[in-house]
Amino acid sequence: MSTPTTVYRSLLRQLREMNVIYKTSTLKQKKGFTKTQKDFLVYTKACLRNNKVEQLSKFQEVVAFLKSGNQHELLFNRHHPLANVNELEKVKLAARRVGLESPE
């Protein structure tokens, strides 16, 4: 069984990874956690200090959920590289693919 410390650390790890994965070029995000994530971490820390087994297992499920979401986003971006590209860039890439240069 995991200890509260390992669950909290794995939760931090997944939230940091989520911030890196979901950051896009259009969204200028500061380093660190969002306000919602900070509030969640404060709540998590308070709950894990109680050392209740049912709360610990719920947070383990949250970690598994975040991990699977991060993995899904990585795989989606790998298999659909044009998903986060605007229409003009898609046209330029398609033209370049067939040997044409699109006008500026």
Curated annotation (Swiss-Prot):
Top-level division of the source organism's lineage: Eukaryota
GO BP: mitochondrial proton-transporting ATP synthase complex assembly
Mitochondrion is among the record's keywords: yes
GO cellular component: mitochondrial matrix
UniProt keyword NADP present: no
UniProt-listed Pfam families: Complex1_LYR_2
Keyword terms of this UniProt record: Mitochondrion, Stress response, Transit peptide
Subcellular compartments: Mitochondrion
Described purpose of this protein according to its UniProt entry: Needed for the assembly of the mitochondrial F1-F0 complex at high temperature.
Family: Belongs to the FMC1 family.
Protein's recorded name: ATP synthase assembly factor fmc1, mitochondrial
